[in-house]
Amino acid sequence: LAGTVARSGLIDKRGIKVGDLVLMTKAVAVEGTAIIAREFGSRLQDLGLAPDEIETCRRFLDNISVLPEAAVAASVNGVSAMHDVTEGGLATALEELSSAGNHRIRIDMHKIPVYSETARICGLLGLDPMGLIGSGSLLLCCRQYACDQLLREIRKAGIEVSLIGEIREPGKGIDAQHQLQPVTWPRFEADEITRLFSA
């Protein structure tokens, strides 16, 4: 996909600064949850997932576009970066964002939204949702003064959004914490979904 944009409207990841806040829309592993429900429905049913729960997960694909929230974010002054989550899940996407913006990122693990259906499926199959393909979720960075407006406008559009972290000093990498305690950031050589298809 290629296109043009006025220089004044360009949102470049290299523009992130120390103190910018990090938001994500929807939840982790939206696409991965849907794919697993579509491709491994019988297996999930054998593991105890009800047919209506599986159907709910399949319909996650109906909500996979990030264009609506990207359009809203582009209209808010103070947005410094956007990055869509894809293969490798949220963990990989945040590493990519850090690398592209050349700043470390602090992430509050307990603030990362996980749909109950995703948690259930990943628990049954032994997968980590942080490394599961996550198309459908958009990462956003913004100046602190813009955060409240950005949250408000995205929610007004009917889209879930959460504040999950903050841009730190120049460099590359993720500083993860849970309830203010440092924790190890998960890294994945391949998307978690490949373990299902290669089994």
Question: What would you call each of these model-derived segments?
Answer:
Residues C142-D148:
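Helix N-cap motif at beta-to-alpha junctions
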Residues R7-G15, T25, A70-A71, E95, ...:
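A generic local secondary-structure boundary/capping motif
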Residues L1-D12, D52-A71:
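Active-site glycine-rich loop that binds ribose-phosphate moieties when present
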